[in-house]
Amino acid sequence: MMSKLYGKVPNNRFAQLKNEIADYEELKAEIPTGVEDYERINFQKKKILNYVNATEDNYNDYHWQLKTRFTNSKGLSELIALTEHETSTLDEVASKYRFAISPYYLSLIEPGNANCGIKKQSIPSASELDDLGELDPMDEKGHSIHDIITRRYPDRLIIKITNVCGMFCRFCQRRRLIGE
């Protein structure tokens, strides 16, 4: 009796699972794994190193990465092919919110791809100038027991030891505090 039950369930379950991933199976050959990007990233890295007149040793030094962050549009339009509109928007947003991207993260951006996830995470866009949202959507200030300590949950704390970051991500909920 058990063998009959086990014999049927896996076949039915297998068919069900296979059906659920059918769309993935059709597209999986087109999904980049990251290996394909190696040459592009390496090309971008060399382009950046040439632009800032640096070496591979510099590039592998995190101190150099922090010191050499891009904090405005200067150079970015050449390195990642920003349009004139993107360049002026970047400068406008950067005048209101701090902006920085390390050479490493810059090398990951796919030039010319408006939907590049790294670009969206790191390069300011016009939508940041909309003031429709709240400045503190997570009510960090209301949950802060001190300027540098936020306690939203009884069993954990967020301790903000610095207001400096290697890259000011565009989605960061604390960007209103950066530089204070």
Tell me the role of every PLM-derived stretch.
Residues 1-151:
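Flexible, acidic/Gly-rich N-terminal and inter-domain linker regions that tether
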Residues 99-101, 145-173:
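N-terminal pre-triad scaffold of radical SAM enzymes
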Residues 176-180:
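Conserved alpha-helical substructure of the radical SAM core
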